[in-house]
Amino acid sequence: MKKLLVLVMVLCIGLSWVVSQEAQAAGKEPYVIGVPVDLTGPASFIGKPVEAVIKLRVDEFNKAGGINGRPLKLVILDNESAPAKTVLNTKKLIDVDKAVACLGYSSSGTTLAALETAESGETVLYSHASSDKIWIPTKKWVFNVVPRTMEACTPMMVDNLIKQGAKKIAYIYIDNAMGQTGLEAFNVYVQRIGIKPAIIEKYEPAATDVSAQITHIKNSGADGLFVDGLAADAALALKTARELGFKAPINFGYGVVGPEFIRLASKYGEGVLSTSLRALVAKELPDSDPQKKVAVDLYEKYTKAFGDFSLYAGHGWDSISITAQTLAKVDPNLDPTKEEDLKKIRSQLRANIEGTKNFLGQNGIFSYSPDNHNGLPPGCYVSVVVENGKWTLYKRK
């Protein structure tokens, strides 16, 4: 009986500690985190998993007592995959909602549109998009969590095509900020390794027919194709190529990695290659990989809560995790509801993010500096292949 009483007392103490931690955070005004993210429109397949994982992480932080004894409060706004809407959302989050930081920007076009608003509003903008123009040249208030296209994707996919036997590689890209960044990286890399593209084609973001471009590619004599786009348009390019009789290997930029592309590509998706962050194939990583533990943790939590894992969940995990870690170093006596204190919080947070070193994230190991607001080294991503309707770690046979 005494043992049972002791056990009950221990459980009660533990429960009261958890409750007190949440109560402590709930007793102070929150730090507002703005999340302008694409929940509708062409980039929604990126935005939805980002929203999901940010909510998941913030719930974890708040249950642990918040940051500096304050809860984190999310204000989530749908950018609708539209640059103009993104600018309006960013301005509202900064001026009306008094966000200490804004994170979740899903695409290059929407992110680029909002840069000036964040800079003039002196508030951290954390981008989840790939264009180098977002952070080169360095903007004081803008940071990124996505590896450079030149370092994360293009060389790996071109090299894989060459190893698959391609000698005349064609390239087709979506004609927007993301695709144009990909084109620049492709041109730089093929020139570096001394090969001439068979042909380069492009298509509009809203394209529903790319048969003309694929016909040009087929007639060029290309024996390998690199497609740089997002899930729906890239799947369209793949299906069109196969239906028009293009039988050579086709590889993709990392804009396709997720369950949406596999669903849209259907039978044509089997065997295609792309690149991904490690969490997508977490359990296949060697134990020696320093990111395996955090990757497995995210994969298991995400799939348990939401089902199929998405590459883009890692972007959200990194931005909210770094934000929370660096927000904890801000002067805890500053009140985010007071205008002058809010300015100081934003400024200290920015400086703390810029000073982040060796943060073990999903997209890589981050070390920012005044001259580098991307923070990621080469070699962050791994090659993946669709096998039996799932993305798996690519191991060249």
Name each region found by the language model.
Residues 4-397:
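Extracytosolic ligand-binding ectodomains
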